[in-house]
Amino acid sequence: MRTGSRLLLVLLVWGSAAALNGDLTVRPTCKPGFSEEDYTAFVSQNIMEGQKLLKVKFNNCAGNKGVRYETNSLDFKVRADGTMYAVHQVQMASKQLILMVTAWDPQTLGRWEAIVRFLVGEKLQHNGHKPKGRKSGPVDLAQQQSDTLLPWRQHQSAKGLRRQKRDWVIPPINVPENSRGPFPQQLVRIRSDKDKEIHIRYSITGVGADQPPMEVFSIDPVSGRMYVTRPMDREERASYHLRAHAVDMNGNKVENPIDLYIYVIDMNDNRPEFINQVYNGSVDEGSKPGTYVMTVTANDADDSTTANGMVRYRIVTQTPQSPSQNMFTINSETGDIVTVAAGLDREKVQQYMVIVQATDMEGNLNYGLSNTATAIITVTDVNDNPPEFTTSTYSGEVPENRVEVVVANLTVMDRDQPHSPNWNAIYRIISGDPSGHFTIRTDPVTNEGMVTVVKAVDYEMNRAFMLTVMVSNQAPLASGIQMSFQSTAGVTISVTDVNEAPYFPTNHKLIRLEEGVPTGTVLTTFSAVDPDRFMQQAVRYSKLSDPANWLNINATNGQITTAAVLDRESDYIKNNVYEATFLAADNGIPPASGTGTLQIYLIDINDNAPELLPKEAQICEKPNLNVINITAADADIDPNVGPFVFELPSVPSAVRKNWTITRLNGDYAQLSLRIMYLEAGVYDVPIIVTDSGNPPLYNTSIIKVKVCPCDENGDCTTIGAVAAAGLGTGAIIAILICIIILLTMVLLFVVWMKRREKERHTKQLLIDPEDDVRDNILKYDEEGGGEEDQDYDLSQLQQPETMDHVLNKAPGVRRVDERPIGAEPQYPIRPVIPHPGDIGDFINEGLRAADNDPTAPPYDSLLVFDYEGSGSTAGSVSSLNSSSSGDQDYDYLNDWGPRFKKLADMYGGGEED
């Protein structure tokens, strides 16, 4: 019985198309492919960068021209001669590494593969022979099932040779994408060497089997053949990792699971796709060949490690083809577009449109797939064209004394891009204007230079200016470009003479003099100067402002004299200064005028006597309780004011007898009682105040002193204050008159209110509130809904004599509001009651009737009853005219009361006169 078991893997070897179709009839003499199917190399644990590992041999039966090698690892590459080397330093993580090497012939598009094994630190032995790889080539599908076993070791023992269990390393399974089938398509066969002893069931697990995407791969549980069930797409998934399991019929594990790695071989089924369909770039005009412009990028979804995903770029067309049809070139691998020729000039060509093509298969136009994009290259402007004046000389004219006036417009020509720093002009005056009268501003729209006056020019000083101006750009000129001689021009500016206003050389002229000078005094001569030296003109003077009307000016020579006495204490004086403004006007065309201000500083003289302060005060009856502080005010200033002298006059003698003054200092003194007691009242105390002027002035002022009884604090009591007020006879009479007028007004108001109340009471007696129908509308004919026809002539109803046309109408249907046809009843005529001779009797009669019936209204109301239709429900109604005299008795109406007295008078008759 064996001590170990084996799990066998039968691989399908992918070869040429003839092998896939099972065509075994044609076997060429030269069969393209690798010399071996498996290559083995022994390597160290640490592989150095560039280290040669082995050399594979391949023959395409055409001299291997154009054959390219690829590996499925980024760590290793194969040179054109088949030498395999390490791209960089590699640290082997396991004892064995298996790679796949692919040879690709771009002419026939054939692909051949071989397995390369790297074994770390051991020499592989197999019966003393190096294992041979299997040659790839067309084989029959029926013959593809073969057992692939790794060499095993035999160990010497006491019992002889013993076969040990082998470790299986399954090489990757490569499946081309986009296969057309038929499906399912067999890939490999998995078999255990125990299948001869027991029944084994095989299964696979992993992504693509029992995990999404589900059922991409399947396995025959009995034979162990594994299939792919549908076309593969490497762009969806590039590899699959499955595990193969072998169990018995009871589900017990027979072999350890083995790992299956399935790689989807890329096919060229995706075109390169540009990231953008339109790329925008720019390059300066005049750039040298080789100047970088922009980069275009296209991505290919195919494997970038194979030719299927290797994109190459080229320029298809260039528009316009000026000055050369090949102004740009592109790096075929990176997509960088650079200039290849000189002569880029924005003024000639501002933009290029370049069509770029990206092709995979390393740019092979015969086999590769392509796509295009547009690159728009804008030639940016550089300052390679200096601005130039359109003419060498310019001229202008300006009136004198004018500023912010445009004298001349300077035009330039610049072929650079408008409204850019390379085009915007800057003007400078380089000579001819040392005083800075002019400046040149740039019009942002037209780029013209506007020569502007910023400092007024004087015709009498300069009649003309000769300016030299230069123009440049905001941006400096490009390297190698020189300024043009046309960038400089001359500007001639003529100054025209205008009538200038006269001016006062010493404006705000200040003079000093004492106040009080007499009228007619000559103060000064305030003359003006006419700057127009070349014009014969006369200057006339007049007053413009003289607030106090104190001054006169001579209209010819400007001499100023006083028209009134100047008073320093006047309200028109501010800080001892009086200001007046004068006008000087010439007789030019048009006339011009100027103003000047004269300031007169008035020196004070002692012309104002001091005034005593305060004017009123109060003091207690007893002299020891309080005093009055007094001072003085003087309209003058030092030294014509204090110190002041305060004294009492000698006449009348009672003043000095009752009062006394005590000096405190030069400005203040105290007034107090001299006697021990003074009766409460108001006293006029005269005081003489003298200033310190030269000569001194004095003034006798009256101070009203209220003498009143005081409390212990020295304050006047209320009674004392009233008594001290001392109302005079006139004040008392005025107060009495006011009181009498007020009482009279109150009395008149009371009388008026009484009369009004009496009238209101009288009217209330005549009117019952319930029967008061004044200002009320009483409707007696409301019978529901109102009259349908409101459009009728009321006058026709009131004038029967106008109804003849109605009587003549033919019988028929009539409106209910029409007057009935036929004779109307005649009522007896009531005797006429003579009108009362006296209107008073008539009024009294009505008043008596109202007194008898308090509910009667104060006046009669006219009630109008409209006609309500013809006919009656009664059989017959006798005419009023045919009724007997007994029927005409209306005496019972007299019993209805005063409210029906009028009705009784109308129908009851009356006594004959």
Curated annotation (Swiss-Prot):
- Indicate how the chain sits in the lipid bilayer: Single-pass type I membrane protein
- The entry's propeptide annotation covers 20-166
Q: Where is the signal peptide?
A: 1-19
The biological process GO terms on file are: adherens junction organization; calcium-dependent cell-cell adhesion via plasma membrane cell adhesion molecules; cell migration; cell morphogenesis; cell-cell adhesion mediated by cadherin; cell-cell junction assembly; homophilic cell adhesion via plasma membrane adhesion molecules
- Report the glycosylation sites: 280, 409, 554, 629, 658, 699
Mapped to this chain, the residue ranges on the Extracellular side of the membrane are: 167-731
Matching SUPFAM superfamilies, A to Z?
Answer: Cadherin-like (SSF49313)
Gene Ontology MF annotations: beta-catenin binding; cadherin binding; calcium ion binding
Q: Which ranges does the record mark as transmembrane? A: 732-753
Q: Which residues lie on this side of the membrane: Cytoplasmic?
A: 754-913
The entry's localization annotation reads: Cell membrane
Expression sites by tissue: Embryonic brain and neuronal retina.
A GO cellular component term found in this entry reads:
catenin complex
This protein's UniProt keywords = Calcium, Cell adhesion, Cell membrane, Cleavage on pair of basic residues, Glycoprotein, Membrane, Metal-binding, Repeat, Signal, Transmembrane, Transmembrane helix
Major location (coarse): membrane
Record remark on domains? Three calcium ions are usually bound at the interface of each cadherin domain and rigidify the connections, imparting a strong curvature to the full-length ectodomain.
Function per UniProt? Cadherins are calcium-dependent cell adhesion proteins. They preferentially interact with themselves in a homophilic manner in connecting cells; cadherins may thus contribute to the sorting of heterogeneous cell types. May play an important role in retinal development.
The protein, known as: Cadherin-4
